[in-house]
Amino acid sequence: MASNKHFDKSRSNLSNNSDIQEPGRPPAGHSVKFAQRTSSGRYINYSRDDLDSELGGQDFMSYTVHIPPTPDNQPMDPSISQKVEEQYVANSMFTGGFKSNTRAHLMHKVIETEPNHPQMAGSKGSSCAIPGCDAKVMSDERGQDLLPCECDFKICRDCFIDAVKTGGGICPGCKEPYKNTHLTDQVDENGQQRPMLPGGGGSKMERRLSMVKSTNKSALMRSQTGDFDHNRWLFETTGTYGYGNAFWTKDGDFGSGKDGDGDGDGMGMEAQDLMSRPWRPLTRKLKIPAGVISPYRLLIFIRIVVLALFLTWRVKHQNPDAVWLWGMSVVCELWFALSWLLDQLPKLCPINRATDLQVLKEKFETPTASNPTGKSDLPGFDVFVSTADPEKEPPLVTANTILSILAAEYPVEKLSCYVSDDGGALLTFEAMAEAASFANIWVPFCRKHAIEPRNPDSYFSLKRDPYKNKVKSDFVKDRRRVKREFDEFKVRVNSLPDSIRRRSDAYHAREEIKAMKMQRQNRDDEPMEPVKIPKATWMADGTHWPGTWLTSASDHAKGDHAGIIQVMLKPPSDEPLHGVSEGFLDLTDVDIRLPLLVYVSREKRPGYDHNKKAGAMNALVRASAIMSNGPFILNLDCDHYIYNSEALREGMCFMMDRGGDRLCYVQFPQRFEGIDPSDRYANHNTVFFDVNMRALDGLMGPVYVGTGCLFRRIALYGFNPPRSKDFSPSCWSCCFPRSKKKNIPEENRALRMSDYDDEEMNLSLVPKKFGNSTFLIDSIPVAEFQGRPLADHPAVKNGRPPGALTIPRELLDASTVAEAIAVISCWYEDKTEWGSRIGWIYGSVTEDVVTGYRMHNRGWKSVYCVTKRDAFRGTAPINLTDRLHQVLRWATGSVEIFFSRNNALLASSKMKILQRIAYLNVGIYPFTSIFLIVYCFLPALSLFSGQFIVQTLNVTFLVYLLIISITLCLLALLEIKWSGISLEEWWRNEQFWLIGGTSAHLAAVLQGLLKVVAGVEISFTLTSKSGGDDIDDEFADLYMVKWTSLMIPPITIIMVNLIAIAVGFSRTIYSVVPQWSKLIGGVFFSFWVLAHLYPFAKGLMGRRGRTPTIVYVWSGLVAITISLLWVAINPPAGNTEIGGNFSFP
């Protein structure tokens, strides 16, 4: 019979097989194993499972022995045991998944270099000097050893307790009695102790919430509309609760402790101070001047009227000489008018917004009676960074993005960063570890000298004076040192692929030698067989990498590997930790703490649909909810970094302002670096980000564009916004009354926080929606409460009391990370609503647009945050082929949306009509390519046939054409005026609209139809990101010509129109009765087409000056020859000769 002693919150939990129940797992009942791996990757432990496997059919029974407290066995202070356990958890790699145990592998070494920050995984620590004990000496927040004796004898926590209890309090080193035998006092003497949560006597989940569980009482507390009653979800305390929707005492003595009801923290005085202060908003809405917006709206109305009259005239006046030409042109013009209307109507209400960061600081970080140190009351922030392939997304780019996040101006203890590696590559893992190591130097340097931007690669590449406005005398010295360290950091990261390959080859050779020796020992005289050992990928500590190997093998391939979670930087302490002057930099007055950094690679197994980026994002949502549970989430692509260190605070101004609880997300504009100065292919996309998105901000808000978006976690969970009704009155309700009960499509139904009121609802429906993780389910109301605005004004509804978020965050323990492993498993989403109604929505290559649409469809609003200094910057493909494939993916997603239930025509009544039109245009715009291609060929057909779309160029046609053109130009000028874009940017957008419309959009329509009709699945390759190492030619990709079938339609249009111009010109010259009006009309429209396709033609030429002159000569000769041939074959009527006596041979 085997038995294991189980001590709560002790190191024996980490060294033995601890029976930690995982609520998020299937009924199989896996356990979390803390074990040491050998160099070959085998785990050494003696759990019941291992004994069963080794001893075969013998029956074993395990039980847990709880030893009662005795003089020799006293329970340890929970704060100390939690702190030590967090230290072990932060230095362990957790793996697990489908049909496998969750294991924590203690990482003695994460990277080849030595970590130099106490928060980093694998940081160096001294070992216990007691013979036979290999435990680590307890350390403080600075990583310094805590030694209880003046002789500096190194002893671990367990051995120190044994020496005090059984050794008479004698130091094993100097044999002198300890002056202090209390472990808590030893910690207090050497470092600061973390304050505990209120009511620390309860368990972790009991400390999270104080919930009224009576179903009868909850029925009374529920509002008449069925809205969630926010008074029930409050943090534990002995007094009454805050201001806003919570209860206040009538005499206003909350927190005064006069009658024993308050807790004496002075929060009542703070609330009175809030009421007495003049209320200041965090954001302001800046309307467009009436002198600009009024003429703009008037011109839209005039153009609509003129278009209607013009199309009516076109339909009534046919061209009997070319009815086919007239018919095609009229159909195309009707569609263009509809497309323009769908694009223009949502632009009727553009607005601008501004934030006030000073007010944010005053409200959330100003010292008060209850918060004398001015500890931040801002909510937590979880930042998601996604990467999938280190070959196409260079690790150095991702590492720079991580460094910009870690250095952001936001309370360190409130900020967490999660890196999703969907490829499970060791290269990405070690690059993130290198970034965490370099952050020890980079982040304090940024804080000390107020560096902008805080991406080191971008900062050291700035083409301006780096010493401008820097007042500290040691800045030059510090910058030089940091620059040297960054150069070494880049060398280490760029050499990681070769380092990992050499390391793996060396270990593989060693394993082969071992196997050959074993073979010789087992087979003395028998012939030797070739030794075949799978070529594994090895980590720096000499063990197998649990993710994807360089040479794919079973359980170690891109689509088949275990889930991995590694805490790269453990959670920081709650109090500032200042540096010292003796180090690399003088950091005496600089906070050297770093935010929580977690590496996550979700489990992938064959037979499970992983849903690409959307699935990776949902895995991060669940894992982060368990580990940090920040009520707000910012998602960034790996090549988009924080350019403005205050960007997070600016976004938080909107969420924390009055009415901010109804905002589902704050979208920031995308800004790009590395674009050619002329922006040949409209990569900046300023018309969309500065015109369309500002206009949507005046409605229900901008669409979600995939990156640079700050989410409210509770909105991602599929809940309705606060104070929402099932149906809002529409413009047709007066004429067609809506029935009281209506069936709503399943994907349009939203969860309500009132669904949690009934305990039976929790037990039955909630796991079916979110999965069977109780940790995840219990975190939902916590995120809802923490995400509320501050109740500092009577008009603020659904507010939270001040100071509620100044409590320290909970420490990480093994069960928490084990639960996070469970929720990123491949099977977790089975039979749940993840991806269908919760989180990022599956089923489209543009999951971002669909996810934002679902939120707006539930009644949520979003805002557009344009900061004075760009919030984020990224890279964009400047190569023509890559740009076309990017546009193809976007357009294909739009076609999928149009043929799905996410079509805006099926939107709920909660969505405004203009917002619905905007989403409808998102699904319709690729279909314009069909009519656009036809219309681009019409000028050529007109020149070839000698006819035109109208019978004659009369005054009516020309007047209509002139008015339509003038109104279009005036609208463009006014858009430029209120949006701030340039005329060149507007023209580049027009050019690429035609380039993309005649190439990528047409292919997207065909692919979308194939998927809908034939069920052909669509797959796209990942867009390659530039590593930024090509300093010789920054725009080398711009001139690279890579052939793709998407180029065929534009090339054909260019060639046909050029030939048609030559043919029409030749025919008119040699005609007896030249028809110059038809020639001018055809040539004008052909030049209109060619002018739009000029950037495309320029891209085909490659680098300037590389196209041989003979190519242009032969092109001209071929065009002239074809023109003469056409005239010879089809000469003008009544004349069989060309140019008099000259005849074509």
Curated annotation (Swiss-Prot):
Entry's transmembrane regions: 291-311, 322-342, 930-950, 956-976, 1002-1022, 1046-1066, 1079-1099, 1109-1129
Location of this chain's protein in the cell: Golgi apparatus membrane
GO CC aspect terms: endosome; Golgi apparatus; Golgi membrane; trans-Golgi network
InterPro entries: Cellulose_synth, Nucleotide-diphossugar_trans, Znf_RING/FYVE/PHD
A GO term for molecular function: cellulose synthase (UDP-forming) activity
Amino acid composition bias (Basic and acidic residues), ranges on this chain: 1-11
Keyword Endoplasmic reticulum: no
Alphabetic keyword roster: Cell wall biogenesis/degradation, Glycosyltransferase, Golgi apparatus, Membrane, Transferase, Transmembrane, Transmembrane helix
PANTHER family: X-BOX TRANSCRIPTION FACTOR-RELATED
Family as reported in the entry's similarity comment: Belongs to the glycosyltransferase 2 family. Plant cellulose synthase-like D subfamily.
Function comment: Thought to be a Golgi-localized beta-glycan synthase that polymerize the backbones of noncellulosic polysaccharides (hemicelluloses) of plant cell wall.
Name by which UniProt lists this protein: Cellulose synthase-like protein D2
Organism for this UniProt entry: Arabidopsis thaliana
